[in-house]
């Protein structure tokens, strides 16, 4: 481990809190499936509508932050990843549809997984309020909650009542400084 993910994450790892036994689902852009940071943690990869598209830096960054071996918050967690067409992410119904498809796929898969492999968290780098498809996404988040899955998204305030908007620290400062 030669990189510090910051926010005191290393001290958690030193205490044995590494994500072992945790299963994380991600719906994002096409993934570099052989990336050294997370390829050993990738348990399932499903590619919807991205054939021929290049892999995305965003999806790889999200996977690395989640389960990366040197920068991950939970480097021993398992990763279940659904890839969607990056051109479809945005503000319209056609943008919401791939997120609905990906989240539905993960929730359906979760019902088939053995207890020890069931998802604990799903990350979606997408937010919604009154967009077309927003009601359906909110219903899927409720379905996830009923299954004991926490859904991290840009709509976390609307779905969980949490007002979270970042660390508000200087990115050039000590990555473990949480005083801001």
Give a label for each model feature.
Residues 1-11:
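Short coil-to-helix leader/linker segments, especially the first N-terminal amphipathic alpha-helix
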Residues 1, 178-179:
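Intrinsic low-complexity, glycine/proline- and repeat-rich
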Residues 6, 60, 135-138:
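Residue-level marker for well-ordered alpha-helical positions
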Residues 13, 19, 85-178:
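Substrate-binding/access-modulating region of protease and related hydrolase catalytic domains
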Residues 11-24, 29-43, 51-98, 115-119, ...:
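Subtilisin-like serine protease catalytic core
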């Amino acid at each position: 481990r030669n990189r510090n993910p910051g926010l005191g994450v290393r001290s958690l790892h030193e205490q044995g809190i590494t994500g072992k036994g945790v299963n994380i689902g991600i719906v994002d852009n096409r993934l570099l499936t052989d990336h050294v940071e997370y390829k050993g943690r990738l348990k399932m990869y499903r590619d919807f509508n991205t054939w021929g598209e290049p892999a995305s830096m965003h999806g790889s960054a999200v996977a690395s932050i989640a389960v990366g071996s040197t920068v991950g918050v939970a480097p021993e967690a398992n990763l279940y990843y659904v890839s969607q067409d990056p051109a479809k992410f945005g503000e319209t119904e056609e943008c919401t549809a791939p997120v609905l498809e990906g989240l539905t796929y993960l929730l359906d898969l979760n019902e088939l997984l053995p207890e020890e492999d069931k998802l604990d968290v799903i990350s979606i780098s997408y937010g919604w309020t009154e967009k077309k498809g927003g009601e359906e996404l909110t219903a899927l988040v409720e379905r996830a909650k009923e299954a004991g899955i926490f859904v991290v998204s840009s709509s976390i305030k609307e779905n969980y009542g949490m007002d979270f908007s970042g660390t508000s620290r200087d990115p050039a400062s000590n990555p473990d400084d949480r005083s801001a």
